[in-house]
């Protein structure tokens, strides 16, 4: 079997394709959440606590000295990333909760009775004929 054929079979298996779609959608969702946090949530929050831009919050550990740049701890960006994480984690929690609820519904739904085979139909007809003969 050629490597290309093996790779094609591997890549087209359901789980791999589903995983690829999930990664792509997850990356896009991550960008949306980052924008939501940095552009929508953090500005009003910063305004409420005194007009602070969270991206600019930092602690200078060592000032710049000549060509050596300053050593800065950007804790504002870290706070913003925590908000990103909390929103993504909550969205994933809700999605999994909904999926589990749908899965439970499917499991609770009784399976349809299988259609009788030709033999079962024939036996049922014979039974019905015998019942009719006994009544007469």
From Swiss-Prot:
Parts of the chain that traverse the membrane: 10-30, 76-96
GO molecular function term, any single one: mechanosensitive monoatomic ion channel activity
Keywords associated with the record: Cell inner membrane, Cell membrane, Ion channel, Ion transport, Membrane, Transmembrane, Transmembrane helix, Transport
A GO CC term assigned to this protein in UniProt: plasma membrane
Pfam family, one: MscL
InterPro entries: Mechanosensitive_channel_CS, MS_channel, MSC/AndL, MscL_channel
Membrane topology: Multi-pass membrane protein
Top-rank taxon, per record: Bacteria
Disulphide bridges, residue numbers: none
Subcellular location: Cell inner membrane
NCBIfam families linked to this entry: mscL, PRK00567.1-1, PRK00567.1-4
Record text on subunit structure and interactions: Homopentamer.
Family listed: Belongs to the MscL family.
Functional note: Channel that opens in response to stretch forces in the membrane lipid bilayer. May participate in the regulation of osmotic pressure changes within the cell.
Name the UniProt record assigns to this protein: Large-conductance mechanosensitive channel
UniProt organism field: Pectobacterium atrosepticum (strain SCRI 1043 / ATCC BAA-672) (Erwinia carotovora subsp. atroseptica)
Name of the gene encoding the protein in the UniProt record: mscL
